[in-house]
Protein backbone atom coordinates (compact mmCIF):
# COMPACT_ATOMS: atom_id res chain seq x y z
CA UNK A 1 0.00 0.00 0.00
CA UNK A 2 1.23 3.47 -0.88
CA UNK A 3 -0.49 6.85 -0.40
CA UNK A 4 0.48 10.41 -1.11
CA UNK A 5 -0.44 13.92 -0.06
CA UNK A 6 -0.07 16.50 -2.83
CA UNK A 7 -0.40 20.13 -1.70
CA UNK A 8 0.19 23.14 -3.94
CA UNK A 9 2.67 25.59 -2.36
CA UNK A 10 0.45 28.59 -3.08
CA UNK A 11 -0.57 29.27 0.52
CA UNK A 12 -0.42 27.93 4.04
CA UNK A 13 -1.96 24.59 4.86
CA UNK A 14 -5.45 24.96 6.32
CA UNK A 15 -7.90 22.60 8.01
CA UNK A 16 -9.31 21.26 4.73
CA UNK A 17 -6.13 19.98 3.11
CA UNK A 18 -4.58 19.19 6.50
CA UNK A 19 -7.43 16.74 7.01
CA UNK A 20 -6.57 15.08 3.68
CA UNK A 21 -2.94 14.78 4.75
CA UNK A 22 -3.89 13.31 8.14
CA UNK A 23 -6.31 10.79 6.60
CA UNK A 24 -3.69 9.60 4.09
CA UNK A 25 -0.99 9.34 6.72
CA UNK A 26 -3.09 7.52 9.33
CA UNK A 27 -4.45 5.16 6.65
CA UNK A 28 -0.86 4.16 5.85
CA UNK A 29 -0.04 3.78 9.54
CA UNK A 30 -3.08 1.58 10.02
CA UNK A 31 -2.16 -0.67 7.08
CA UNK A 32 1.66 -0.61 7.30
CA UNK A 33 1.79 1.37 4.07
CA UNK A 34 4.16 3.99 2.69
CA UNK A 35 3.33 7.71 2.75
CA UNK A 36 4.98 10.16 0.34
CA UNK A 37 4.76 13.93 -0.06
CA UNK A 38 4.33 15.37 -3.55
CA UNK A 39 4.63 19.11 -4.09
CA UNK A 40 2.32 20.24 -6.91
CA UNK A 41 4.29 23.29 -8.03
CA UNK A 42 3.62 23.29 -11.78
CA UNK A 43 2.06 26.76 -11.45
CA UNK A 44 5.32 28.69 -11.27
CA UNK A 45 3.60 32.08 -10.96
CA UNK A 46 1.73 31.19 -7.77
CA UNK A 47 4.04 28.63 -6.16
CA UNK A 48 6.76 29.65 -3.72
CA UNK A 49 9.49 27.94 -1.72
CA UNK A 50 8.35 29.89 1.32
CA UNK A 51 4.93 28.22 1.25
CA UNK A 52 6.52 24.83 0.50
CA UNK A 53 8.69 25.13 3.61
CA UNK A 54 5.70 26.29 5.65
CA UNK A 55 3.63 23.29 4.54
CA UNK A 56 6.40 20.85 5.42
CA UNK A 57 6.94 22.48 8.82
CA UNK A 58 3.23 22.28 9.63
CA UNK A 59 3.01 18.63 8.58
CA UNK A 60 6.02 17.78 10.73
CA UNK A 61 4.49 19.61 13.69
CA UNK A 62 1.31 17.57 13.24
CA UNK A 63 3.52 14.49 13.59
CA UNK A 64 3.30 13.37 9.97
CA UNK A 65 6.42 11.92 8.37
CA UNK A 66 7.02 10.68 4.84
CA UNK A 67 9.45 8.29 3.21
CA UNK A 68 10.41 10.83 0.55
CA UNK A 69 9.21 13.97 -1.20
CA UNK A 70 9.43 15.29 -4.76
CA UNK A 71 8.42 18.35 -6.76
CA UNK A 72 6.42 18.20 -9.97
CA UNK A 73 8.44 21.12 -11.35
CA UNK A 74 11.45 18.80 -11.68
CA UNK A 75 9.65 16.07 -13.64
CA UNK A 76 8.73 17.75 -16.92
CA UNK A 77 10.82 15.23 -18.88
CA UNK A 78 8.69 12.39 -17.50
CA UNK A 79 5.48 14.20 -18.41
CA UNK A 80 6.75 14.91 -21.93
CA UNK A 81 7.27 11.19 -22.57
CA UNK A 82 3.70 10.37 -21.56
CA UNK A 83 2.33 13.30 -23.55
CA UNK A 84 3.90 11.88 -26.71
CA UNK A 85 2.32 8.49 -26.01
CA UNK A 86 -1.12 10.05 -25.64
CA UNK A 87 -0.66 12.07 -28.83
CA UNK A 88 0.38 8.97 -30.75
CA UNK A 89 -2.74 7.20 -29.50
CA UNK A 90 -4.87 10.16 -30.66
CA UNK A 91 -6.07 10.68 -27.08
CA UNK A 92 -4.67 14.21 -26.97
CA UNK A 93 -5.91 16.58 -29.66
CA UNK A 94 -5.17 20.27 -30.36
CA UNK A 95 -7.86 22.93 -29.96
CA UNK A 96 -7.68 26.54 -31.08
CA UNK A 97 -10.77 28.22 -29.63
CA UNK A 98 -10.15 31.35 -27.60
CA UNK A 99 -11.63 31.79 -24.13
CA UNK A 100 -14.20 34.17 -25.62
CA UNK A 101 -15.25 31.63 -28.25
CA UNK A 102 -15.61 28.89 -25.66
CA UNK A 103 -17.65 31.22 -23.44
CA UNK A 104 -20.03 31.95 -26.33
CA UNK A 105 -20.43 28.22 -27.05
CA UNK A 106 -21.21 27.59 -23.40
CA UNK A 107 -23.74 30.43 -23.29
CA UNK A 108 -25.45 29.17 -26.44
CA UNK A 109 -25.76 25.63 -25.10
CA UNK A 110 -27.15 26.81 -21.77
CA UNK A 111 -29.70 29.10 -23.44
CA UNK A 112 -30.87 26.10 -25.47
CA UNK A 113 -31.32 24.06 -22.32
CA UNK A 114 -28.37 21.81 -23.14
CA UNK A 115 -25.44 20.89 -20.85
CA UNK A 116 -22.28 22.96 -21.54
CA UNK A 117 -20.25 20.09 -22.99
CA UNK A 118 -17.44 20.79 -25.45
CA UNK A 119 -18.58 19.89 -28.97
CA UNK A 120 -15.25 18.42 -30.15
CA UNK A 121 -15.28 20.66 -33.20
CA UNK A 122 -11.47 20.70 -33.21
CA UNK A 123 -11.48 17.00 -34.08
CA UNK A 124 -12.81 18.00 -37.51
CA UNK A 125 -9.61 19.89 -38.32
CA UNK A 126 -7.31 18.17 -40.78
CA UNK A 127 -3.59 17.83 -40.13
CA UNK A 128 -2.98 20.55 -42.71
CA UNK A 129 -5.39 22.94 -41.00
CA UNK A 130 -3.75 22.33 -37.66
CA UNK A 131 -0.31 22.93 -39.13
CA UNK A 132 -1.39 26.18 -40.77
CA UNK A 133 -2.83 27.54 -37.55
CA UNK A 134 0.36 26.75 -35.67
CA UNK A 135 2.50 28.28 -38.44
CA UNK A 136 0.39 31.43 -38.24
CA UNK A 137 1.35 31.77 -34.57
CA UNK A 138 -1.77 30.34 -32.96
CA UNK A 139 -0.75 27.91 -30.25
CA UNK A 140 -3.27 25.19 -29.36
CA UNK A 141 -4.40 23.95 -26.00
CA UNK A 142 -4.70 20.17 -25.80
CA UNK A 143 -7.72 18.17 -24.70
CA UNK A 144 -7.94 14.55 -23.64
CA UNK A 145 -10.45 12.59 -25.73
CA UNK A 146 -12.72 10.67 -23.40
CA UNK A 147 -14.11 7.28 -24.37
CA UNK A 148 -17.88 7.69 -24.23
CA UNK A 149 -18.59 4.96 -21.74
CA UNK A 150 -19.66 4.59 -18.13
CA UNK A 151 -16.86 5.47 -15.71
CA UNK A 152 -17.39 3.89 -12.32
CA UNK A 153 -15.52 2.87 -9.20
CA UNK A 154 -16.15 1.60 -5.69
CA UNK A 155 -15.23 4.56 -3.52
CA UNK A 156 -13.92 3.59 -0.07
CA UNK A 157 -16.00 6.35 1.56
CA UNK A 158 -18.73 7.28 -0.94
CA UNK A 159 -19.56 3.78 -2.14
CA UNK A 160 -20.52 3.22 -5.80
CA UNK A 161 -19.80 6.28 -7.97
CA UNK A 162 -20.33 6.50 -11.72
CA UNK A 163 -20.32 9.04 -14.54
CA UNK A 164 -21.52 8.75 -18.12
CA UNK A 165 -18.59 10.15 -20.08
CA UNK A 166 -21.00 11.45 -22.74
CA UNK A 167 -22.05 14.05 -20.18
CA UNK A 168 -18.49 15.25 -19.57
CA UNK A 169 -16.39 17.67 -21.60
CA UNK A 170 -13.02 16.46 -22.80
CA UNK A 171 -10.71 18.01 -20.18
CA UNK A 172 -7.93 20.41 -21.14
CA UNK A 173 -4.61 18.88 -20.06
CA UNK A 174 -2.14 21.32 -21.62
CA UNK A 175 -2.56 25.09 -21.87
CA UNK A 176 -1.66 27.05 -24.98
CA UNK A 177 1.54 28.25 -23.28
CA UNK A 178 2.62 24.64 -22.75
CA UNK A 179 2.02 24.51 -19.00
CA UNK A 180 0.18 21.53 -17.59
CA UNK A 181 -3.08 21.54 -15.71
CA UNK A 182 -3.57 19.41 -12.61
CA UNK A 183 -4.85 16.23 -14.26
CA UNK A 184 -1.97 14.91 -16.34
CA UNK A 185 1.03 15.32 -14.00
CA UNK A 186 -1.07 14.01 -11.12
CA UNK A 187 -1.94 10.78 -12.92
CA UNK A 188 1.56 10.33 -14.32
CA UNK A 189 3.13 10.77 -10.88
CA UNK A 190 0.68 8.29 -9.36
CA UNK A 191 1.72 5.79 -12.04
CA UNK A 192 5.44 6.43 -11.69
CA UNK A 193 5.38 6.27 -7.88
CA UNK A 194 3.07 3.22 -7.83
CA UNK A 195 0.43 4.88 -5.66
CA UNK A 196 -2.18 2.31 -4.66
CA UNK A 197 -4.69 4.45 -2.73
CA UNK A 198 -5.74 8.06 -3.38
CA UNK A 199 -7.56 9.79 -0.52
CA UNK A 200 -8.70 13.34 -1.23
CA UNK A 201 -11.61 15.77 -0.89
CA UNK A 202 -14.96 15.23 -2.54
CA UNK A 203 -14.31 18.21 -4.84
CA UNK A 204 -12.09 15.80 -6.82
CA UNK A 205 -14.83 13.28 -7.63
CA UNK A 206 -15.35 14.56 -11.20
CA UNK A 207 -11.56 14.71 -11.64
CA UNK A 208 -11.36 11.05 -10.68
CA UNK A 209 -13.62 10.15 -13.62
CA UNK A 210 -11.14 11.88 -15.95
CA UNK A 211 -8.16 10.34 -14.21
CA UNK A 212 -9.46 6.79 -14.49
CA UNK A 213 -9.58 7.15 -18.27
CA UNK A 214 -6.08 8.66 -18.34
CA UNK A 215 -4.81 5.72 -16.27
CA UNK A 216 -6.38 3.36 -18.81
CA UNK A 217 -4.99 5.28 -21.79
CA UNK A 218 -1.50 4.96 -20.30
CA UNK A 219 -2.15 1.23 -19.73
CA UNK A 220 -1.74 1.49 -15.98
CA UNK A 221 -3.51 -0.20 -13.10
CA UNK A 222 -6.07 2.04 -11.40
CA UNK A 223 -5.62 2.95 -7.71
CA UNK A 224 -8.38 2.71 -5.13
CA UNK A 225 -10.10 6.02 -4.39
CA UNK A 226 -11.61 7.56 -1.26
CA UNK A 227 -13.26 10.99 -1.32
CA UNK A 228 -13.89 12.51 2.08
CA UNK A 229 -16.58 15.19 2.53
CA UNK A 230 -15.86 18.84 3.18
CA UNK A 231 -15.70 20.44 6.58
CA UNK A 232 -18.30 23.18 7.03
CA UNK A 233 -18.87 25.72 9.77
CA UNK A 234 -21.60 25.38 12.37
CA UNK A 235 -24.11 27.07 10.05
CA UNK A 236 -23.36 24.59 7.26
CA UNK A 237 -21.34 27.01 5.13
CA UNK A 238 -18.00 26.08 3.60
CA UNK A 239 -14.67 27.54 4.68
CA UNK A 240 -12.44 29.68 2.53
CA UNK A 241 -8.93 28.25 2.23
CA UNK A 242 -7.66 31.83 2.51
CA UNK A 243 -9.06 32.12 6.03
CA UNK A 244 -5.81 32.50 7.93
CA UNK A 245 -7.30 31.82 11.36
CA UNK A 246 -7.94 28.22 10.26
CA UNK A 247 -4.38 27.56 9.14
CA UNK A 248 -2.43 24.87 10.96
CA UNK A 249 0.24 27.45 11.73
CA UNK A 250 -2.34 29.52 13.61
CA UNK A 251 -3.54 26.54 15.66
CA UNK A 252 0.07 25.70 16.52
CA UNK A 253 0.85 29.28 17.55
CA UNK A 254 -2.28 29.47 19.69
CA UNK A 255 -1.10 26.46 21.66
CA UNK A 256 -3.11 23.48 20.46
CA UNK A 257 -1.62 20.02 20.93
CA UNK A 258 -0.91 18.24 17.64
CA UNK A 259 -2.50 15.07 18.99
CA UNK A 260 -5.74 17.01 19.55
CA UNK A 261 -5.84 18.11 15.91
CA UNK A 262 -5.08 14.59 14.67
CA UNK A 263 -7.82 13.20 16.88
CA UNK A 264 -10.40 15.81 15.92
CA UNK A 265 -9.85 15.77 12.15
CA UNK A 266 -9.83 11.97 11.98
CA UNK A 267 -13.05 11.39 13.86
CA UNK A 268 -15.15 14.48 13.12
CA UNK A 269 -18.07 13.40 10.98
CA UNK A 270 -17.55 9.72 11.73
CA UNK A 271 -19.48 7.12 13.69
CA UNK A 272 -16.77 7.21 16.38
CA UNK A 273 -16.91 9.46 19.41
CA UNK A 274 -14.24 12.15 19.67
CA UNK A 275 -12.77 11.28 23.05
CA UNK A 276 -9.55 12.80 24.42
CA UNK A 277 -6.60 10.58 23.52
CA UNK A 278 -2.92 11.24 24.21
CA UNK A 279 -1.47 8.10 22.60
CA UNK A 280 -1.03 8.05 18.81
CA UNK A 281 -1.07 4.26 18.76
CA UNK A 282 -4.51 4.34 20.32
CA UNK A 283 -5.71 6.72 17.59
CA UNK A 284 -4.32 4.44 14.87
CA UNK A 285 -6.01 1.44 16.44
CA UNK A 286 -9.35 3.28 16.70
CA UNK A 287 -9.35 4.71 13.15
CA UNK A 288 -11.51 3.13 10.46
CA UNK A 289 -11.82 5.08 7.21
CA UNK A 290 -15.13 3.43 6.41
CA UNK A 291 -16.63 4.97 9.55
CA UNK A 292 -16.42 8.42 7.94
CA UNK A 293 -19.76 9.93 7.00
CA UNK A 294 -20.61 10.60 3.36
CA UNK A 295 -22.00 14.01 4.26
CA UNK A 296 -20.20 17.17 5.36
CA UNK A 297 -18.94 17.41 8.93
CA UNK A 298 -19.50 20.54 11.00
CA UNK A 299 -16.30 22.00 12.39
CA UNK A 300 -16.59 23.70 15.78
CA UNK A 301 -13.70 25.66 17.20
CA UNK A 302 -15.32 25.35 20.64
CA UNK A 303 -15.41 21.55 20.35
CA UNK A 304 -11.77 21.47 19.28
CA UNK A 305 -10.82 23.74 22.15
CA UNK A 306 -12.69 21.54 24.64
CA UNK A 307 -10.98 18.46 23.22
CA UNK A 308 -7.59 20.11 23.64
CA UNK A 309 -8.48 21.09 27.20
CA UNK A 310 -9.50 17.54 28.10
CA UNK A 311 -6.48 16.05 26.32
CA UNK A 312 -4.11 18.19 28.39
CA UNK A 313 -5.61 16.73 31.55
CA UNK A 314 -4.36 13.29 30.50
CA UNK A 315 -0.69 14.30 30.46
CA UNK A 316 1.51 13.56 33.45
CA UNK A 317 4.15 16.04 34.56
CA UNK A 318 6.91 13.92 32.99
CA UNK A 319 5.06 13.99 29.67
CA UNK A 320 4.55 17.75 29.70
CA UNK A 321 7.63 19.10 31.52
CA UNK A 322 9.55 19.76 28.29
CA UNK A 323 6.71 22.00 27.09
CA UNK A 324 6.73 23.95 30.33
CA UNK A 325 10.44 24.42 29.76
CA UNK A 326 9.84 25.56 26.17
CA UNK A 327 7.47 28.31 27.30
CA UNK A 328 10.07 29.34 29.89
CA UNK A 329 7.90 28.57 32.87
CA UNK A 330 9.60 29.32 36.17
CA UNK A 331 7.51 26.70 37.95
CA UNK A 332 9.10 23.42 36.88
CA UNK A 333 7.31 21.36 39.51
CA UNK A 334 4.93 18.43 39.38
CA UNK A 335 2.70 20.04 42.02
CA UNK A 336 2.33 23.11 39.81
CA UNK A 337 1.24 20.98 36.85
CA UNK A 338 -1.27 19.05 38.97
CA UNK A 339 -2.69 22.37 40.15
CA UNK A 340 -3.14 24.03 36.75
CA UNK A 341 -3.89 21.22 34.30
CA UNK A 342 -7.60 21.12 35.10
CA UNK A 343 -7.87 24.89 34.64
CA UNK A 344 -6.24 25.50 31.26
CA UNK A 345 -7.06 24.91 27.61
CA UNK A 346 -3.46 25.33 26.40
CA UNK A 347 -0.14 24.53 28.04
CA UNK A 348 1.12 28.04 27.31
CA UNK A 349 -1.47 29.36 29.78
CA UNK A 350 0.85 28.11 32.51
CA UNK A 351 2.50 31.54 32.33
CA UNK A 352 -0.77 33.20 33.35
CA UNK A 353 -1.05 30.88 36.34
CA UNK A 354 2.50 31.69 37.38
CA UNK A 355 1.41 35.30 37.72
CA UNK A 356 -1.67 34.28 39.69
CA UNK A 357 0.27 32.05 42.09
CA UNK A 358 3.02 34.62 42.55
CA UNK A 359 0.43 37.18 43.63
CA UNK A 360 -1.34 34.72 45.89
CA UNK A 361 1.93 33.73 47.57
CA UNK A 362 2.53 37.38 48.34
CA UNK A 363 -0.65 37.69 50.43
CA UNK A 364 0.24 41.13 51.76
CA UNK A 365 -0.32 42.60 48.29
CA UNK A 366 -3.91 41.34 48.32
CA UNK A 367 -4.96 43.55 51.24
CA UNK A 368 -7.17 40.82 52.66
CA UNK A 369 -7.61 40.18 56.35
CA UNK A 370 -5.65 37.14 57.55
CA UNK A 371 -8.63 35.82 59.48
CA UNK A 372 -10.72 35.74 56.28
CA UNK A 373 -8.00 33.78 54.49
CA UNK A 374 -7.73 31.32 57.38
CA UNK A 375 -11.50 30.81 57.42
CA UNK A 376 -11.58 30.22 53.66
CA UNK A 377 -8.82 27.63 53.97
CA UNK A 378 -10.43 25.90 56.97
CA UNK A 379 -13.80 25.59 55.22
CA UNK A 380 -12.43 24.45 51.84
CA UNK A 381 -14.03 21.06 51.01
CA UNK A 382 -11.96 18.02 50.12
CA UNK A 383 -11.49 16.85 46.52
CA UNK A 384 -13.12 16.05 44.23
CA UNK A 385 -14.80 19.36 43.44
CA UNK A 386 -18.06 19.48 41.49
CA UNK A 387 -20.74 22.01 40.51
CA UNK A 388 -22.03 22.17 44.11
CA UNK A 389 -18.66 22.85 45.76
CA UNK A 390 -18.67 26.61 45.28
CA UNK A 391 -22.10 27.12 46.84
CA UNK A 392 -21.32 24.89 49.83
CA UNK A 393 -17.99 26.58 50.43
CA UNK A 394 -19.24 30.17 50.17
CA UNK A 395 -22.25 29.32 52.37
CA UNK A 396 -19.94 28.07 55.13
CA UNK A 397 -17.71 31.15 54.88
CA UNK A 398 -20.80 33.37 54.99
CA UNK A 399 -21.98 31.73 58.21
CA UNK A 400 -18.55 32.14 59.83
CA UNK A 401 -17.85 35.73 58.70
CA UNK A 402 -21.27 37.23 57.99
CA UNK A 403 -19.94 38.49 54.64
CA UNK A 404 -22.04 38.24 51.50
CA UNK A 405 -22.26 39.58 47.95
CA UNK A 406 -19.22 41.51 46.72
CA UNK A 407 -17.76 41.61 50.22
CA UNK A 408 -17.52 37.83 50.09
CA UNK A 409 -16.83 37.10 46.44
CA UNK A 410 -14.25 39.81 45.67
CA UNK A 411 -11.71 38.69 48.29
CA UNK A 412 -12.30 35.03 47.36
CA UNK A 413 -11.59 35.88 43.74
CA UNK A 414 -8.39 37.64 44.75
CA UNK A 415 -7.31 34.68 46.87
CA UNK A 416 -8.01 32.16 44.11
CA UNK A 417 -6.77 34.08 41.09
CA UNK A 418 -4.75 37.06 42.20
CA UNK A 419 -7.03 39.16 39.98
CA UNK A 420 -9.78 41.59 40.90
CA UNK A 421 -11.77 40.86 37.73
CA UNK A 422 -13.48 37.59 36.97
CA UNK A 423 -11.40 35.30 34.80
CA UNK A 424 -14.48 35.02 32.61
CA UNK A 425 -13.70 38.55 31.43
CA UNK A 426 -9.97 37.98 31.27
CA UNK A 427 -9.44 34.62 29.63
CA UNK A 428 -12.24 32.07 29.53
CA UNK A 429 -10.01 28.99 29.38
CA UNK A 430 -8.03 29.99 32.48
CA UNK A 431 -11.11 30.06 34.74
CA UNK A 432 -10.49 27.68 37.66
CA UNK A 433 -12.59 24.56 37.89
CA UNK A 434 -13.57 25.63 41.40
CA UNK A 435 -15.26 28.86 40.26
Describe the residue ranges of each PLM region.
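N-terminal Rossmann-like or analogous alpha/beta NTP/dinucleotide-binding catalytic cores
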Residues: 1-112, 206-220
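Short, conserved secondary-structure transition motifs
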Residues: 74-78, 230-235
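Active-site cores that bind ATP or allylic diphosphates and position pyrophosphate for catalysis
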Residues: 94, 98-227, 233-239, 247
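Structural motif
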Residues: 251-259, 294-296, 300, 329-335, ...
Amino acid sequence: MKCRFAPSPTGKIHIGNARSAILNWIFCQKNQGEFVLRIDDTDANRSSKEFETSIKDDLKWLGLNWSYTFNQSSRQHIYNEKIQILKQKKRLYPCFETEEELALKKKSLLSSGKPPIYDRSSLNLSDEEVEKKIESGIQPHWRFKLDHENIGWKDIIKGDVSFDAKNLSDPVLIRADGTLLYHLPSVIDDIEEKITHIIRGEDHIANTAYHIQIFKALESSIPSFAHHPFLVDETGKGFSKRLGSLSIENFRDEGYENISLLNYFLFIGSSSNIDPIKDLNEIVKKFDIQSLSRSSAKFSIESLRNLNENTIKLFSYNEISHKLKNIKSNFQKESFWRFIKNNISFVNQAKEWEEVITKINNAKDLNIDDSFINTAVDELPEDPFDETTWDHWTSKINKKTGLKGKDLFMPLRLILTGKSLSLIHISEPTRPALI
